[in-house]
Amino acid sequence: MGEFDYELPERAIAQNPAEPRDSAKLLVDLGHGQPFEHASVANLPELIVEGDVVVVNETSVIPARLQLKKATGGVVEVLLLEPIAGGWSALVRPGRRVKSGTELRSEKDPDLQVIVGDEIAEDGQRKIVVLHRDEPVANASETVRLSKAGESPLPPYIRSKAHAPGRYQTVYARTPGSVAAPTAGLHLTEGLLQQIRDKGARIEKVDLVVGIGTFRPVTVDDPADHVMHSESYKVDESAWEACQAAERVVAIGTTTVRALESAARGTLSGRTNLFLRRGSTFEIVDALMTNFHMPRSTLLMMIDAFIGTRWKDIYREALEKDYRFLSFGDAMFLHKTES
């Protein structure tokens, strides 16, 4: 596992997104031993050619983080994870001090009521019932009713709240459900997408619900022993057919890769625990725009599978050139290394 470790200085972790969105730096790796190129995301259309299919993840981050209070006045934080039968799975903090049956209320929205149930998973997940005006909030599409009390959950390494709330959402976000953003897509603007279309490329959308597991590092010595988290995904038939017919498929973000490569190995929708790591093949994706990832993460291992150990040179170059890392950081454009 040491080979997937690298030193990430605190100063390199972006605390706020680039403004405007497409002003973020873009490190371009053309492969085949060619030197790296340094550009900005605004230059992305120059890397796209006629006939490309560019695929984005249109998932939307829900207001899943709720600051609530018990009747006694104690503060409790609830992080909604995903709908389950009769309620939601959620992380509750401080979990051990909140008994099953406890009712929680929001000072921001008196119409919101949360009832904490039993523990349902080894990691402390609890079953909870969410009510708004006495009506159940039963699925992700209904979480818009929580917007007054809830907020988008930011990754634990982002402490700044100086950015506008909408900046942790892509401009094309449509399908509610995620508790984390598909961060490579945060760089794209409507204008940039139109420039890509003007190049004769086609833009297609998939939906992969990004779960809390995306932040979990690999803690075992052998990646083969890592238990990969599962997420829901959907690839429309029209998008699938476009990718099948394309000369080159460009994925925006690792979540898009996971959706497409899961579809290639099974069905066009469902749940996936696909772990793309060294030795994995990429059946659909030819090029990838993605952010710089955490050490020892499954996302970094996906990059290693996609381009080989060249990622180490890319990350070293990025740190030397003061690129910003992680969710609000800069990006890189990679071409698949043929094995």
Predicted segments with their positions:
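Surface-exposed, charge/polar-rich loops and edge strands
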Residues: 1-339
